[in-house]
Amino acid sequence: MKKHLAAYLVVLLTIVGFLVVADGVSAKVVKARRWRPAAEAVDKASQQPKAYLVMEATTGKVLEEQNMHEKRAPASMTKLMVAYIVLDRIAKGENHLTDMVRTSAVASHMGGSRVYLKEGEEFSLEDMMKALMIASANDAAYAIGEFISGTREDFVDLMNEKAKALGMNDTEFHSPHGLPPDKGQKEDLTSCFDMAILARELLKYPKVIEWSSTKTADFRNGTFILNNHNKLLSRMPEVDGLKTGYYRETGYNVTVTAKRGDLRFIEVVMGSATWKARDEFAVEKLKRFFAEFTAVNVAKKGEPVGEEVYLSDGKYRKIKGVAAADVSIPVLRDRKKDIKRVVNLPRAVKGEVKEGQKLGEIVFQLDNEVVGKVDVVSPQYVPKANFFTRMVRKTGLNL
């Protein structure tokens, strides 16, 4: 009997022990589940960038921002100013893409991202620009700076001069490449707002999109492959530029341009903890704004505009002006009908009228804010009436 009782007690204690252990496991699982949302919230907060901005490219209007004037190191986004200087000089005829750029000893020893330029090696300015914009080559940036201004110091002065002229008031450049400063040197500084200003200016030059949207390209006769650091080019079909930037102290940065139809956004993200967090954040913002906004066609090139304009001295007495260009206004989808159109035309124009001559303008407004303009021009040449006709008209006769 005692043996049976002892056996029963062993079985009972085993079952109770199992239940206690099982309950302990269950409690741990419940506890983990209970705290998971808080952990996720902390993790999500840690993935937020230090600063960002979303701008509508046509109007330059800032749609959303956080710390957009906070000065931060742009890292390789510094190279966007190099691109602007080169493209501006080419537009003015001061340089050509076929110009040959020679590599100095200093340029050949640049670290970080590079195309391993050798001292004395020469490439066309266009090849150097591809290395700069696609592969973020620091050696190419340095070589271009020396080619344009003679010395690194003089080129940096030019960079700051251009920044000031563009109204980039949060910016100070100290290098053409954006690498971390050596001991005793100052770091490059800018803001999301200033990078957006620069990006908007760069969009005036189609070449910058051609280069920055290229995922891979050959260099040095195909012996070296340029790989684009901007992974957003593969994430969203709308993304076509512009430049990433990173070093440990500043975090992950990117200046993005994206276009869908007539709608284009510029987004600048600075100080993300990881490149994945930066890209996820950028994509989320772009998707939301593409969903919320639309481009409204408010003027079509060549369409008649307003009342006829009286020609005081023309062979013909009146002419009807036309819109000089197509105009699309970005607007929230539920505000499409709120855009107002104001036509400003003179009562009369003296002398001959040339084809394409400006007669007036159309101003587009939303909430009393100007959101777009287009010239009203003459669709044809109207010569001055002869002397006899003009004299007769002064008598009041309609000739």
For each of these PLM feature ranges, what is it?
Residues 3-4, 80, 260:
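Hydrophobic alpha-helical segments, especially transmembrane helices
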Residues 25-197, 202-206:
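Active-site-adjacent loops and short helices of periplasmic peptidoglycan-processing enzymes
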Residues 15-24:
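C-terminal segment of classical bacterial N-terminal signal peptides
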Residues 10-13, 195:
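Small-residue packing motifs within transmembrane alpha-helices
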Residues 168, 172, 183-399:
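Domain-terminus/edge residues, biased toward the C-terminal soluble/receptor-binding domains
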Residues 1-10:
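Bacterial N-terminal signal peptides that target proteins for export
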